[in-house]
Amino acid sequence: MTLSLEQLSARMRQGEDVPLSDTARIALALSIPSILEQLVVTAMEYIDAAMVGHIGAEPPAAIGIVSSSTWLLHGILVGLYTAFSIQIAQYLGADRRQDARGVLRQSMLFNLILGLGAAAFGVGISRFLPGWLGADISLQADASAYFAIWSAALPFTMAMGMYTAMLRATGDALTPSLISVLVCVLDVVFNFFLINPTRQIQLFGQSVTVWGAGLEVPGAALGTALSTTIGGLLALGVLLLRDGPLCIRKPGSWRITSACLRNLWRVGTPLAAERAALSSAQVLLVRIVSGLGTVAIAANSLGVSAEGLCYMAGYGIQDASIALIGQAVGAHRRDMAKRFAWLCTMMGIGIMALSGAGLWLFAPALMGIFTADAAVIALGAQVLRIEAFAEPMFGASIVASGAMQGAGDSTGCFVLNLFSMWGVRLTLAFLLAPRLGLVGVWAAMCIELCIRGALFLIRLARGKWLDKGALQ
């Protein structure tokens, strides 16, 4: 019988020795729903990208121009709200449930204030952003509309990400996965009607008229905004209605505490800075790619979507590692934290090695899902096969960073990611792009991911990431 995370935390607090078989089972129990969720999310993104890609090369290029900016803005917000879920995991590990519920309440106030501010900022700059990024004039209107609609939904996007992360911190990986899968399905349904115009389709041998808004790129953004809004409301509803360690119907204060703010500053600020560093580097990479032509822009954008099949499994395991290490650190069990960290990291390396092999084998077929443009397919398949070799070490960096974040060592993650992205990837891409085009950009990415993985494994082995200790 597999232990629940709550039972494991109780045994850790009592100083019991938990067998390796039990720790492996609970790691799998938390990882598998998250991995399946990420794979379904990626599959839905494939369908989403294919719906836009089959319109032509320009629509995915328009989305690709602003995609790095969506990563930047969303990444900063993710870094900040991840600090709340780390606090909750550590408080639950220490059996401080009232403190955990207090953090949840404060996170709701944070989400409301920062979410609305981020939405206003994104909508405000959307008109000018594509021009700043060097987009061709023919792409700017669609790119601007996409970013504005996406930004308007940020409060709900934040709510979904924040509250599902908190549910995972309690050991409930299934409910967040179900919410995410539903959101992806709704996204595809909304896109089906919003992207395409009214048309005739064949259904069981009969010609049927299907209504469509014909919005193309803005329709894709609107479908995403509507589906994430529903997801955010569902996640909030679970926390409001379910009786559990984070049930906010139980008595508690909504007062913002100095301890929560200190922990948010200590953990959240480096995480937000890390996301900003990674995403701003992506913005500069898009600036480099945007000068390589529409085919390269489309191949780059769709190639990133195709690669998601590999690394999303790593992020699923990362979700589990944050919860597991967070609770182990909260229970003051460094030995268990180390065990979970290495167990999850090895799982990430193994799964992403297998998916990397699949990426190399099926690269042309994957690109063919997204677009019918032969030039985009050929270039996209070429760069995906380069990237396939980096997947195992990418997995190491993803999961090891999650383990370190769960322990509160967000500063170490920030430094390693800053060096690898800005010192290695951007430098190599700048040097190789003029000579090799998009192939040079992706070769730089492959080299950098291998170096990043090695750096994270070295830090994991040294153990200094555990010196941060439990939160206040």
What residues fall within each predicted segment?
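Short alpha-helical transmembrane segments in multi-pass integral membrane proteins
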Residues: M1-S34, I88-P155, L186, Q202-T269, ...
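N-terminal transmembrane alpha-helices
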Residues: V18-A50, H54-I55, S68-Q87, L112-A119, ...
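Residue-level signal for transmembrane alpha-helical positions in Major Facilitator Superfamily
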Residues: L28, I32, M44, L80, ...
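Transmembrane helical elements of multi-pass membrane transporters/channels
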Residues: A29-D48, I149, M160, S227-G231, ...
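Helix-terminus/linker motif at the lipid-water interface of multi-pass membrane proteins
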Residues: L39-A61, P130-I137, F193-T198, S207-L215, ...
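Alpha-helical transmembrane segments of multipass membrane proteins
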Residues: Y46-A50, F128, M162-M166, V188-F193, ...
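Small-residue-enriched core segments of transmembrane alpha-helices in multipass membrane transport
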Residues: S180-D187, S305-G308, L418-T427
